[in-house]
A protein has these predicted regions:
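Compositionally biased regions
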Residues: 11, 15-22, 442
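Short, solvent-exposed loop/turn segments at the edges of extracellular beta-sandwich modules
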Residues: 432-438
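Broad gene-expression machinery/nucleic-acid interaction feature
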Residues: 426
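C-terminal edge beta-strand
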Residues: 440-450
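N-terminal acidic, glycine/proline-rich low-complexity segments
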Residues: 18-402, 411-415, 419-422
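Bacterial N-terminal signal peptides
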Residues: 2-14
Length: 451
């Protein structure tokens, strides 16, 4: 039996842009499918990697709907660092007019200024409780209450206690049924675990989707590449600091929700630029040892369960690293280039004419021939395109062989192997232009058995 490239989009929520988000919409920006994101960050502390990640995030803000940038504590009782966060945002705002030449999806300066807030003023769970609301925790509460239709992701680059305070307030002020509805909207991506509040949240709100990534290093570019492609792109690049330890340790959290057609954030086990994660929750994933050094312990919340890294660890990010580098480099060129036609822009990867970004589900029987087509793909700069179809082995579940008859053709076909499990066969279409730097867009096709 021959299965044509029929289209069945993901049955999950249809995510659109909020009318009050401060983001504009345009065909060039492809804002459909953007994810809501709030970041809590200890930017301004001893490690400058939060500033690095913040600049990277902001130049990607046409593909992510940022709803809050919150200055938070980690394990150290630091002075308020909100002003340093505001300064970083202001440096980005300087280049916003130029960026908007290249993508209309960027937020306005006024909007970005309005979503910077101070979080808890004490670290750990010491900063959580009655009468301890902060502008940051109130911002999170308001975002959770907003009936947007999309999940709300929180990326924790520092501590989690501002999120814990928001949940404390909701639980103490809302009826149980309403509270459960609210927290069903929330998702957390925790970098390393930097205070005891993460374990508290996982213990007390076990229904929350809570990812803790301990495999955030080893994918970032070297210092020379960073200097040439990021820091030398003035004026914004001048504010991208040299590393002290690792580069951009927090970036996997927003790369996970970056809308490029590769990942589905609602399925941590699928994998993408921000890593791949376990399908089942793991018991007592410990945070950084700084928690215990500061006199706290996550063991008081045992047993708690979180979603952890998949067995391949940081390789789940490294496999995409060149495309991540090129994407960042192109965006830094956008910050300088005042003429659209003098910069490179992302191709649009289409599957059988569909130009969305959600996964495509196909249903077939063992032995069927499935015809795959990237028809409808195009490049806004009229660059030639390269196509590459590949099997994403790790999230797939099958027995037998998956062979592409023309893996580098616009169209190709495979024969469904003898057994396909419940997780299906994950095929990744990469569409790469021949501009400089080369940019890649994706589609994910998941083949499952006809039940």
């Amino acid at each position: 039996m021959v299965i044509l490239a029929a289209l069945c989009l993901s049955p999950l929520l249809s995510y659109g842009s909020s009318a009050t988000s401060g983001y504009s919409e345009g065909n060039d920006s492809q804002t459909d499918g953007n994810v809501r994101l709030i970041v809590t960050t200890d930017l301004g502390g001893s490690d400058p990697d939060d500033i690095q990640s913040m600049i990277h995030l902001l130049v990607c803000s046409d593909r992510i709907d940022i709803e809050g940038l919150i200055s938070s504590e980690a394990w150290v009782d630091d002075p308020d660092k909100t002003e340093k966060l505001r300064q970083t945002v202001e440096h980005f705002i300087e280049v916003l007019p130029t960026l908007r030449i290249h993508s209309s999806g960027y937020p306005s300066a006024e909007y970005l200024q309005s979503i910077v807030a101070q979080g808890q003023d004490k670290p750990h769970m010491d900063g959580v409780g009655e009468g301890k609301d902060s502008p940051g925790s109130d911002l999170i509460v308001d975002a959770i209450r907003e009936d947007d239709g999309r999940p709300l992701w929180v990326a924790a680059w520092g501590g989690m206690n501002t999120v814990a305070q928001a949940l404390h307030k909701l639980k103490s002020t809302e009826a149980e049924e309403v509270f459960r509805k609210y927290i069903s909207r929330l998702r957390i991506y925790d970098i390393l675990g930097q205070d005891d509040a993460g374990a508290y949240i996982a213990k007390n709100y076990p229904e929350l989707v809570y990812i803790r990534n301990k495999e955030v290093y080893g994918w970032a570019p070297n210092d020379q590449w960073t200097k040439e492609n990021i820091q030398n792109k003035l004026p914004l690049g001048a504010h991208y600091p040299n590393r002290i330890w690792a580069t951009e340790g927090d970036s996997p959290s927003f790369l996970y929700v970056y809308s490029n057609g590769l990942n589905d954030p609602e399925h941590p086990e699928y994998g993408g630029w921000g890593g791949r994660f376990s399908k089942d929750r793991i018991r007592n994933i410990r945070g950084m040892d700084f928690i215990e050094r500061s006199g706290k312990s996550e063991t008081v919340f045992d047993d708690y369960y979180m979603i952890g890294s998949a067995p391949e660890g940081n390789q789940s990010i490294k496999r995409w690293e060149q495309s991540i580098y090129n994407d960042f480099a192109a965006r830094m060129i956008w910050t300088q280039e005042k003429y659209y036609d003098k910069a490179n822009h992302h191709p649009v990867a289409a599957y059988n004419g569909d130009r969305g970004r959600k996964p495509v589900y196909l249903y077939a029987n063992p032995g069927d021939t499935v015809i795959l087509s990237a028809s409808g793909s195009y490049d806004p700069d009229n660059d030639d395109l390269e196509y590459f179809w590949s099997l994403y082995e790790e999230p797939s579940d099958y027995e037998g062989n998956v062979i592409f008859d023309d893996a580098r053709g616009r169209d190709c076909q495979i024969i469904v192997p003898e057994r396909v499990g419940d997780d299906g066969i994950h095929i990744i279409l990469e569409v790469t232009d021949k501009g400089s730097p080369k940019l890649t867009s994706y589609r994910r096709i998941i083949i499952k058995n006809i039940k």
